[in-house]
Curated annotation (Swiss-Prot):
Broad class of enzyme this protein falls into: transferase
Binding site for ADP: 12, 16, 265, 308, 409, 413
Protein name per its UniProtKB record: Glycerol kinase
Binding site for sn-glycerol 3-phosphate: 12, 82-83, 134, 243
Gene Ontology CC annotation, any one: cytosol
Origin species: Nitratidesulfovibrio vulgaris (strain ATCC 29579 / DSM 644 / CCUG 34227 / NCIMB 8303 / VKM B-1760 / Hildenborough)
The keyword Cytoplasm belongs to this UniProt entry's keyword annotation: no
NCBIfam families: glycerol_kin, PRK00047.1
Amino acid sequence: MSNYVLALDQGTTSSRAILFTREGDIKQISQKEFTQIYPQPGWVEHNANEIFDTQSWVMRECLQEAGIGAADVVAAGITNQRETTVVWDKATGAPVYNAIVWQDRRTAGFCDELKARGLADVFRKKTGLVLDAYFSGTKVRWILDNVPGARAKAEKGELLFGTIDTWLIWNLTKGKAHVTDSSNASRTLMFNINTGAWDDELLGILDVPRSMLPRVTGSSEVVGDIHPEFLGKAIPIAGNAGDQQAATYGNACLKPGMAKNTYGTGCFMLMNTGTEVRSSQNNLLSTVAWTTPSGRFYALEGSVFIAGAVVQWLRDGLGIIKAAPEVEQLALSVPDNGGVYLVPAFAGLGAPHWDQYARGTMVGITRGATKAHIARAALESIALQTLDIMDCMQKDSGIKLAALRADGGATRNNLLMQFQADVLGVPVERPKVTETTALGAAYLAGLATGFWKSEDEIATMWQLDRRFEPNMSDDKRQHLVYEWQRAVERAKAWVEA
């Protein structure tokens, strides 16, 4: 009898494989980082072959280290950095260009052109998204227009497009499956979330041939098998969801009104809105959460581009810490931020501002400011950006959040979690298994193959590690928020278009 589900978690900085038990506990984790490529300011790329090579390597290592064979694995689930775009040759499988990463800003000018043509509402109504360089559609167009010969080949049906899930599945199945799920498709600017299908009008505006696009499947169904060459035996690929949707599922936010925030490279808050699309009036995104036998579920999403990455910047850019975990003790060495506010708009501002021309800004610096104040301001910026999103989410949904479930690497930072509860004014719940992105992919795969019987069973498996209760006066909270909002205004529109 197979006792495990394998999750392949392909992230922005590393590829990981995690084995989960029937109880939803972690048996083994394997991780490998890969190269970040910055060809020009504002451009971010990955080598698509390196992504697949690292992912297949950790998949093998994970099973070897756990001392189990492929026969012990009932199914595999995939979750991935979303929006990152790969275009490859259908015949050879070779990418025609590096993967263009979700953080990449090179298509900002084209997004402005589309807005000037009055098309923002067309895209918002059909896709739930804003016209921003973040999403895949404009990246595909850039590749077709800037890689010699790419457009001609695409129009002959010789090129394929995929987000990272599609690229992994294509390679794992040896080219047998060119598929994506509805959650990933909903991040492309080419998918109509109301009809659940690619949209010809949007494809026409973006000038992307339909023949390039993958077939859209559910998030919890068998779409193909990992070829026996990789692990010695075929394993069904039975779950697929973009990383933030998978984390929402892994946090068991299965009922409308439940919300989670993932603290990773960026910060991503999603609220389950049920089987109806809830349009945002406050610059949030409406997105597909997942499609399961229970139906197509939607979410409101607020995306913060820079969260944990601000701590990496303290380490790599400023050199004020040697390792990321040191930031908590450094920040705790001062009682407050000393009036220093850091707006980490290194790649523009995401929700709810959507300012591609904002840049990182630090204000309130005096001679008394120290590296500890900067460290504290950096951590606080993560929580304050999250507050901006929660305020909008509550207005759009009409739901007062009862608690926020938190996951991702930065949730290990107790100072950040407590400050988050303080500024939100609601409890923050950290689960025992914080690898909820991978867990969500595992749940979706296990559900499709009968490893877990129902979503009710999955909901009962979620376990609390620690609940952080708000402990800040209203006056102090209001002052922090007021100063933060002043700092954000100073970061906006810094780059002159």
